Every structure is written in structure tokens, then in C-alpha cells.
């Protein structure tokens, strides 16, 4: 995110200072971005941090680990509700939801999506191919109070920004939300359960 001049502030919340130290030691090419003047690092539990925020963020990226142990709180209704409150009216939250090819991950994805969908008026799942992740196929959640990721996508406005990205394109954006039939079925069952 620090590559983009339009980004004014980044709050990085990490519970364990050793994670930041390890990144600086072993991933210096990426970790050097933490020294950017716009980056503010907070060493605390993200659930506690986000509880204190209201109408503050345009974007929340939840790059959590697995939904158990220290990160378990980042998969709760309380956390998603706090993220909802921390976002501005036009804010967006994205989060990792795992791989659908492993039973535990698929169950966690369903649970996470159900909790987000019960909190945000707009909640979608999108996909990406990430060779270094398990199965090389990963799911993410998109949640917003206002914007639908496809219906409100303005490709002309994005392209007019003339931002150089390594992966993202407006065409890929739309395609990422078109899921395989088995995933659509999993999510449809969840949404029907929410409506009851």
C-alpha cells in the first residue's frame, strides 16, 4: 500500500512485536515499508484495538492467521461488528477466508462469511490463485456498508487513475467474484439459513 501516494495513513496492528522483528530481519524488501512515515504500528490485540475505533477507516484489511488460538477473536461477530463501526459510510473490509479444499478451512470460511453477512449489508466472497498458499487457491471476504464489488465497480474511473499494479486489473476484479458452482452452492445455503 505504501507504493501508492493516494494512501494517507496505514495503521498496522500486530499483537506480537517479534513478528515485526522477524519481518525486518528476514523480509527486508517488504519490511522496509514499515518505516514509511504513513505507517503507524500498534502492538496490541486487534480485537481490542478496533473496539476503540468509530467511523475512522476507509479500508480494513484483516490479514489474520487461522481461526483458532491467538487469532480466534478475529473471526467473531464482535470483531466484525467492531470493524463495521470503525469503517466510514463508504468503507470496505476484506479478510482471508482460507481454502475451500480442506474441510476445516471450508467450515471456517462458511462460519466467517455467515458472521460477516449478518453484520454488513453487502458481503461477498472472492478468489485468488496464490501458489505459496495451501492448494494454491484462496478465498477472501469483501464487506461494505455501501458498495457492491461488481455493481459499483467503475472500471473507467479505476483505469483513469493510471495506477501500476502487478496483479490487479479491473477485469480481474470482476472475475474474482465469479465463483465455481460448488462454492456458490455452499454460500447460497448459508444465506438461506440467515434469512430464516
List PLM regions with ranges:
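Flexible, active-site-adjacent loop/turn segments at secondary-structure boundaries
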Residues: 25, 32, 72-73, 131, ...
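SAM/dcSAM-binding transferase cores
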Residues: 135-196
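Conserved beta-strand signature within the Rossmann-like core of class I S-adenosyl-L-methionine
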Residues: 90-97
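Conserved Class I S-adenosyl-L-methionine
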Residues: 80-84, 106-129, 141
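Short "lid" loop at the C-terminus of a central beta-strand within the Rossmann-like core
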Residues: 66-67, 98-102, 131-132
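Short, solvent-exposed coil/turn elements at secondary-structure transition points
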Residues: 47, 99, 129-131, 146
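The AdoMet/dcAdoMet-binding core of the Class I SAM-like
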Residues: 1-90, 103-109
Amino acid at each position: 500500500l505504501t507504493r501508492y501516494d493516494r494512501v494517507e495513513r496505514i495503521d498496522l496492528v500486530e499483537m506480537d512485536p517479534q513478528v515485526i522483528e522477524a519481518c525486518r530481519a528476514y523480509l527486508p524488501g517488504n519490511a522496509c515499508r514499515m518505516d514509511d512515515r504513513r505507517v503507524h504500528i500498534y502492538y496490541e490485540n486487534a480485537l481490542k484495538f478496533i473496539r476503540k475505533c468509530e467511523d475512522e477507516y476507509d479500508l480494513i484489511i484483516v490479514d489474520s492467521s487461522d481461526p483458532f488460538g491467538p487469532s480466534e477473536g478475529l473471526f467473531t461477530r464482535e470483531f466484525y461488528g467492531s470493524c463495521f463501526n470503525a469503517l466510514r459510510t463508504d468503507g470496505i473490509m476484506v479478510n482471508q477466508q482460507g481454502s475451500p479444499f480442506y474441510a476445516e478451512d471450508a467450515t471456517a470460511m462458511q462460519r466467517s462469511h455467515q458472521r460477516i453477512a449478518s453484520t454488513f449489508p453487502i458481503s461477498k466472497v472472492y478468489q485468488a490463485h496464490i501458489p505459496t498458499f495451501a492448494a494454491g487457491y484462496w478465498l477472501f471476504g469483501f464487506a461494505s456498508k455501501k458498495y457492491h464489488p461488481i455493481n459499483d465497480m467503475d472500471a473507467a474511473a479505476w483505469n483513469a487513475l493510471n495506477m501500476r499494479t502487478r496483479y490487479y486489473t479491473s477485469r480481474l476484479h470482476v472475475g474474482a467474484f465469479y465463483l465455481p458452482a460448488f462454492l456458490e452452492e455452499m454460500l447460497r445455503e448459508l444465506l438461506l439459513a440467515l434469512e430464516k
